[in-house]
């Protein structure tokens, strides 16, 4: 495992992103993991007759991609999720390529609190998720 790097400072406007294509296996595995087997996610025939016209990914699967950026990139090591406001703007379909971008909107070094705007877009540049995250950035153990 690589050495973990704890950052000491961040700046407003700093960004990080991740790109992920949502596969059928991702949706099926997520459904089993959390126990949400809604036919909108699991049944082709049911989903085809729905307002979406085909199977959709779980909203929180997309939300989980935000967590991946926060935990691995910005703020990275030591980031402890305190809150996440999230709004689902459009469905994510199996096969969609999602770009997740987080941007620092506030950094309080005295409190070690970082606030980030969290946005997700599909391959057509349609915004599918927007929100705001607040994290405590812990220091490494001495």
Predicted regions span which residues?
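Mid-chain, well-packed structural core segment of small domains
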Residues: 72-100
């Amino acid at each position: 495992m690589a050495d973990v790097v704890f950052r000491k400072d961040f700046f407003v406007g700093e960004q990080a992103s991740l790109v992920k294509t949502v596969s059928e296996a991702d949706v099926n595995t997520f459904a089993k993991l959390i126990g949400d087997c809604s036919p909108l996610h699991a049944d082709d025939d049911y989903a085809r007759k729905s307002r979406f016209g085909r199977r959709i990914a779980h909203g929180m699967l997309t939300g989980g991609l935000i967590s991946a950026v926060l935990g691995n990139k910005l703020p990275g090591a030591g980031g402890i999720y305190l809150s996440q406001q999230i709004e689902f703007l459009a469905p994510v379909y199996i096969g969609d390529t999602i770009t997740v971008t987080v941007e620092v909107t506030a950094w309080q070094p005295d409190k070690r609190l970082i606030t980030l705007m969290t946005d997700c877009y599909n391959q057509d540049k349609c915004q599918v998720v927007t929100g705001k995250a607040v994290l405590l950035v812990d220091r490494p153990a001495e």
